[in-house]
């Protein structure tokens, strides 16, 4: 997706309030940016929900996982994620802008961290998310 163009289809983001792997705040900010630009983007945060809350039988567990949560990147990728003719890129957390591959390649490792991630099924949130997604899909037909 080119973050600077109109989206080809509506998006509905299903976010867990306590997701410590894919943090909800950057997703919410991105959705709000898209919506402010006139795109049909919405989200819902499910209270108490962790990462993978929508799985049926995920028992509570902590995993030591790698992620890139130390940055929040907005990257213009004209032809997809593997196209390195992108630019510019902007880290919303630091305010730093990148205009070439060398700068980008030197910075990205600073975004990486390993942290403990909580996962657990949440039946109530999952059931509501399914209803919300079905309503969203029905609304775009």
Annotate each predicted stretch with a short phrase.
Residues 1-48:
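The feature captures the conserved acid-bearing segment of alpha/beta-hydrolase catalytic domains
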Residues 40-141:
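C-terminal catalytic histidine-bearing segment of alpha/beta-hydrolase fold enzymes
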